[in-house]
């Protein structure tokens, strides 16, 4: 019977001593790759959450409006905060069926309630971040956005809180905001000039 030819492609790996420099190097590389993957996944998750929020706002904009007032922006945020109401009602209907002993979709219901609570706290606190629909130029850029995440930095964001809805004199607030926006735009331009050089 003929002998099988030795397989040259199969090479046995050398056993590495656990305390050697090579083992430490491989461990460092593995940790570095894990850290890169974790950061990449966290960034992708953050971008997808922001993308979903922006997509919701873009689909609920009034096409005839050239710019929104802060009061109208607050009304839009209120409808954004109630976006899960129909899903919560469906979950409640499923759970109210007679004979069911366990709650169905309990984890989804918990996630939705936590999200709504967190967003409501942001809105009543220092403000929830939405696309800048108060400024007509930024609103036009936002409407032209094609949901590409690479173009996300082009969209200007603004924090709006419930105190904007409760402000007594809208004219004073708007006049002050125009001056503030001019200062912010000049600061943005100076920062971009510094970054280019």
Curated annotation (Swiss-Prot):
It comes from the Eukaryota. Its main location: nucleus. It is found in: Nucleus. Associates with pre-60S ribosomal particles. This is Translation machinery-associated protein 16. Residues 1-38, 168-197 are annotated as: Disordered. It comes from Xenopus tropicalis. Belongs to the TMA16 family. Involved in the biogenesis of the 60S ribosomal subunit in the nucleus. Keywords: Nucleus, Ribosome biogenesis. One of its GO terms (molecular function) is preribosome binding. The gene is tma16. One of its GO terms (biological process) is ribosomal large subunit biogenesis. Gene3D superfamilies: Translation machinery-associated protein 16-like. Residues 28-38 have a biased composition (Basic and acidic residues). Residues 178-197 have a biased composition (Acidic residues). One of its GO terms (cellular component) is nucleus.
